[in-house]
């Protein structure tokens, strides 16, 4: 399978996941710890670029975007998502509770004490996935 990662990067990441130190990996691979550190750093950078690429693509193909305004009660967000997805005839893959958990994990910086303190965008994809985006970034694109 094609990837943005080299075989060496994949091997290093797998060994790190298994708990090996960079020093141990360097010894096994016959190289320096500094080299392993650089390989791991580049792998993580490539992963971040791949994630950003997918986010850009998903944003382009997204049929539905919702601006969550400042002052919105977080508990109202699932209903807003479900209403918008019903309008677009999209089945969202999450329950209200799962959406709340998703919002808690991905939009923490926009929320304080259950209230939205900074607007943000929720994107609903055709496949029912949802994403959170910064409102200012979205505004800059348009």
UniProtKB/Swiss-Prot annotation:
Keywords: DNA-binding, Transcription, Transcription regulation. Transmembrane segments: none annotated. It holds the Pfam family Sigma70_r4. GO terms for molecular function: DNA binding; DNA-binding transcription factor activity. GO terms for biological process: DNA-templated transcription initiation. It comes from the Archaea. Putative transcriptional regulator. Belongs to the Tfx family. NCBIfam families: PRK03975.1-2, PRK03975.1-4, tfx. This is Putative transcriptional regulatory protein Mevan_1098. It comes from Methanococcus vannielii (strain ATCC 35089 / DSM 1224 / JCM 13029 / OCM 148 / SB).
């Amino acid at each position: 399978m094609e990837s943005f990662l080299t075989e060496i990067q994949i091997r290093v990441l797998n060994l790190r996941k298994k708990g090996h130190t960079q020093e141990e990996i360097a010894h096994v691979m016959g190289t320096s710890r500094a080299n392993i550190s650089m390989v791991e750093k580049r792998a993580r950078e490539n992963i971040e670029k791949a994630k950003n690429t997918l986010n850009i693509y998903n944003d382009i193909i997204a049929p539905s975007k919702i601006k969550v305004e400042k002052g919105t009660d977080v508990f109202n967000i699932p209903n807003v998502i479900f209403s918008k997805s019903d309008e677009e005839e999209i089945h969202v893959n999450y329950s209200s509770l799962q959406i709340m958990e998703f919002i808690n994990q991905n939009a923490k910086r926009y929320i304080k004490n259950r209230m939205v303190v900074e607007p943000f965008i929720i994107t609903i994809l055709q496949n029912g996935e949802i994403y959170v985006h910064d409102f200012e970034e979205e505004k800059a694109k348009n």
